[in-house]
Amino acid sequence: MIPGEILTDDGEHELNAGRATLSLVVANTGDRPVQVGSHYHFFEVNDALSFDRAAARGFRLNIAAGTAVRFEPGQTRTVELVALAGERAVYGFQGKVMGPL
């Protein structure tokens, strides 16, 4: 085994199976690119991103761990979010929650 190597079974694997998801239209209203990582609490992303923030509370991007989505200035795109799992408490990021969801 190589450090960091991931060994999986053959076939397809569904990420985040059975978890609540939602789609949101997101626009970068700023003049610089914004990149959002896979596990960032989407409610607390850069304020230059315009979308229904209240709907995004408790959700993150529904993408593979360690990846990110980049929003270029003026770009609008639809993203799929997935509900946070585990204890459903958020600490850090921009400090807008700092506790249970």
Swiss-Prot record:
Pathway: Nitrogen metabolism; urea degradation; CO(2) and NH(3) from urea (urease route): step 1/1. It is found in: Cytoplasm. Pfam families: Urease_beta. The keyword Protein biosynthesis does not apply. It comes from the Bacteria. It is an enzyme of class 3 (hydrolase). Keywords: Cytoplasm, Hydrolase. GO terms for biological process: urea catabolic process. Its EC number is 3.5.1.5. Heterotrimer of UreA (gamma), UreB (beta) and UreC (alpha) subunits. Three heterotrimers associate to form the active enzyme. This is Urease subunit beta. It comes from Burkholderia cenocepacia (strain HI2424). The gene is ureB.
